[in-house]
């Protein structure tokens, strides 16, 4: 019996340098306490017409060849010169902080069109109660493209905290071009129209017994934040050299905007079979390079900006080109923005034409 594993980013067929690796530590404000200013300047994002987005989503959600939208992108120009508060910490050290609020948001994430830090500098981003902290982001996150996308943080306000030590080689370049207001939650609310807990009944949490035989392949699959406000699915794939080059396979219809600011979140799995429980959010890689794509067969091959570290415990999935139709198929994916799922098709695949390309269905 021949099985074929399908990483279900081809939703038309099945429903649907370094990167953003954090380098630990804690915000220096935790240690400084009362010695720094308690009042952090706040930028409040403007309101937008949610009813227009809801109407668009009602139509778009019926489409199987576009990413699933979860947020609204505020286009901004926020940097360390025109916003926030600088404080002199003495001995040549400086601290910059800024609070960004988008009223009613379930999550907030950022896109930096300029990100380049000197050695020794640290950037932390956290929500108001510091229940979720991203960082430290450092010069190890610098890329040739000088941009960066961030993962989603829960809540409608976040704080950016940049620490600069003495005698840095150059001034940091930090400029935010997008603040994404999440209005459909990817994290932990089953009451949102889609997202966590809202995939179809044919989808099983990967921790369930049905997923156990596919434990390795499950570790290759990631959910992607595309263009700041949409999501898709894809998988790390192996190559014939087996050298762990971080090639990542996703769908052509996911392409839009620059892949250099895409965020790839691994291990977003429910730790319980039932009911679904939110998974970890901090196994992320920011940025990739597009290597190849084809609209007819709906594929896009990327190379991540860095290989996931060993602590991520990822797997590089195998592939084959025999052309032999499978007798059954398995899909591992993040349907409708949910935690990772596995589903099964026990019927033999048949050949079909899709956008002029030969496919299995």
What annotation goes with each model-predicted range?
Residues 20-96, 143-151, 156-238:
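Protease-domain processing segments flanking chymotrypsin-fold serine proteases, especially trypsin-like
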Residues 153-361:
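Serine endopeptidase catalytic core focused on the charge-relay Asp
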Residues 1-25:
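Bacterial Sec-dependent N-terminal signal peptides
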Residues 102-109:
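Extended extracellular/luminal ectodomain segments enriched in beta-structured repeat modules
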Residues 116-131:
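Short, surface-exposed beta-strand/strand-loop-strand elements in extracellular ectodomains
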Residues 132-143:
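Solvent-exposed serine/threonine-rich low-complexity stretches and specific carbohydrate-binding patches
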Residues 107, 120-122, 261, 328:
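Exposed beta-strand and adjacent loop surfaces of beta-rich binding modules
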Residues 105, 130, 227-229:
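Glycine-centered tight beta-turn/hairpin loop motif at sheet-sheet or coil-to-beta transitions
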């Amino acid at each position: 019996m021949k099985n074929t594993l399908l990483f279900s980013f081809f939703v038309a067929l099945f429903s649907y340098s370094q990167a953003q690796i954090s380098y630990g530590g804690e915000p220096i404000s935790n240690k400084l306490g009362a010695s720094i200013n308690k009042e952090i300047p706040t930028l409040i994002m403007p309101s937008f017409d949610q009813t227009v987005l809801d109407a668009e989503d009602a139509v778009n959600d019926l489409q199987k060849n576009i990413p699933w939208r979860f947020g609204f992108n505020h286009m901004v120009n926020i940097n360390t010169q025109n916003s926030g508060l600088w404080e002199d910490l003495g001995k040549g050290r400086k601290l910059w902080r800024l609070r960004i609020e988008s009223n009613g948001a379930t999550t907030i994430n950022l896109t930096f069109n300029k990100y380049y830090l000197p050695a020794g500098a640290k950037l932390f981003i956290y929500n108001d109660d510091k229940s979720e902290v991203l960082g430290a982001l450092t010069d190890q996150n610098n890329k040739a493209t000088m941009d960066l996308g961030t993962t989603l943080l829960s809540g409608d306000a976040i704080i950016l905290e940049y620490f600069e030590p003495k005698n840095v080689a150059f001034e940091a370049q930090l400029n935010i071009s997008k603040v994404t207001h999440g209005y459909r939650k990817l994290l932990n609310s089953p009451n949102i129209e889609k997202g966590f807990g809202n995939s179809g009944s044919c989808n099983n949490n990967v921790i369930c017994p049905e997923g156990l035989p596919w434990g390795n392949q499950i570790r290759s699959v990631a959910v992607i934040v595309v263009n700041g406000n949409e999501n898709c699915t894809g998988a790390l794939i192996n190559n014939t050299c087996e050298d762990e080059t971080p090639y990542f396979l996703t769908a052509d219809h996911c392409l839009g905007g620059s892949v250099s600011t895409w965020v790839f979140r691994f291990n977003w799995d429910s730790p319980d079979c039932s009911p679904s429980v939110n998974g970890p959010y901090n196994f992320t890689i920011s940025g990739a390079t597009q290597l190849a794509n084809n609209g007819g067969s709906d594929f896009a091959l990327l190379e991540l900006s860095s290989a996931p570290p060993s602590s991520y415990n990822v797997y590089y999935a195998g592939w084959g080109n025999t052309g032999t139709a499978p007798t059954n198929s398995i899909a591992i994916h993040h349907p409708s923005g949910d935690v990772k799922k596995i589903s099964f098709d026990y019927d033999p695949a048949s050949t079909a034409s899709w956008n002029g390309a030969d496919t299995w269905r």
